[in-house]
């Protein structure tokens, strides 16, 4: 099994400009629904991620090995709904991880789900890229004009500073 781990790095914004704000406003929901119904445009016509980016984790490699999806919302993990404050999410993944997992049958019963062992971050290179993904995302968020609307990093959080802390976040994500 080869799969790429998706890290979600989230930020609280200092202005009501995210989908979170629209979602929690009854009037905005009506506007969104009407815009889609009449024009087939607006937030209901958008993909989940409106911005994508391919980049390299190191200048020493030839082709991009990191992919970003940027979404103008954050999700409350308890409810599965957009948070009640403005937010944005960077979903970042390593495109060509070296780590390999496995899928195992639990029994001969076809109704039994298989046992999936992704084995993420099992190589030093995959760990290096995960750390770089977090550091690079922080650089992007600290760059204008984006920096002017960022209020705070939520996940992994401003206290996550060392390589080991970044890896702990990646492993728990």
Task: Please report, for each region that a protein language model flagged, where it lies by residue.
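FAD-dependent oxidoreductase catalytic-site/capping-region signature
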Residues: 17, 28, 32-173
């Amino acid at each position: 099994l080869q799969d790429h781990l998706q890290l979600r790095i989230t930020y609280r914004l200092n202005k009501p400009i995210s989908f979170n704000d629209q979602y929690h406003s009854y009037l905005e929901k009506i506007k969104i629904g009407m815009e889609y119904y009449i024009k087939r445009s607006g937030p209901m016509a958008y993909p989940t991620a409106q911005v994508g980016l391919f980049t390299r984790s190191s200048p020493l490699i030839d082709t991009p090995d990191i992919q970003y999806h940027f979404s103008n919302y954050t999700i409350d993990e308890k409810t599965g709904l957009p948070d009640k404050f403005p937010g944005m999410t960077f979903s970042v993944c390593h495109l060509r991880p070296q780590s390999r997992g496995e899928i195992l049958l639990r029994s001969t019963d076809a109704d039994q789900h298989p046992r999936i062992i992704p084995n993420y971050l099992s190589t030093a290179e995959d760990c290096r890229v995960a750390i770089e993904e977090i550091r690079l995302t922080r650089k992007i968020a600290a760059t204008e004009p984006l920096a002017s609307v960022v209020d705070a990093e939520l996940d992994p959080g401003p206290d996550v500073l060392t390589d080991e802390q970044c890896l702990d976040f990646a492993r728990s994500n």
